[in-house]
């Protein structure tokens, strides 16, 4: 925020300086309040306009058949961190695309285009099951192409494919789970003079809170959950790749593999370009197919609203404190994640 304009000339008088500085403070407060009200008003207008136009959540696929009238292969992007909604990933958009392909009698296959470090266990398993439903009900194949990265939850989803290709520079794998990454911010809060008291019942109700150091019991609880989701991941890969659980566990220590290593270990079928993948698909389903590719784009209204929120938040605390809080929030993981996190 810019400072109020100063008078070009001032009398060097202690009393006058004191009076000027005293009257300056409420002006600053008043001006800050006006700016905050302005941002809030703009935000409300943006939300109202976006909802009225049906564009708040970004472009989404229609939950019905493409009705394309020609044989097609639907290309579905799985890009960015897998979560409910992000700049490049939208869960409902992907689920709707799968439904569209399933309901289109002219559809011949799905091609997954993967470039992701992974993400939420819930979202990736939901996509995984929706793809299995597509295969079961249509008897059509699924293919997967790994671009620069196909890690963790991304590879979990790719395991549904009948054939997995990867770019020669792709990183593949990271079969593992992060269930708890506790950030103990108690010392930071003490340094800031912040005291938090939460009234609760249940010894582990505050498990994962940044203002409570985790106990040994809580770490053991999260480890048991982590082991359960790890076993689920191993089972998914074993089913998809025709391997035993022992074979998968030998590879599933969380590490990432190069494309050549992944192929050597049976995690992918071939290394090649997207053109090579296309040729493979056409050989399976026929030459006369059109590749249908619908790209998700986040609504500009949602992006603008996010920018306004950030601007308001940054005005309410120092930039250094805001940066520290954001970093701590990103580090704290209290839900199961199939995520490659170097």
What are these regions (language model features)?
Residues 154:
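Pocket-flanking alpha-helical
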Residues 161-179:
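Zinc-dependent metallopeptidase catalytic helix centered on the HExxH motif
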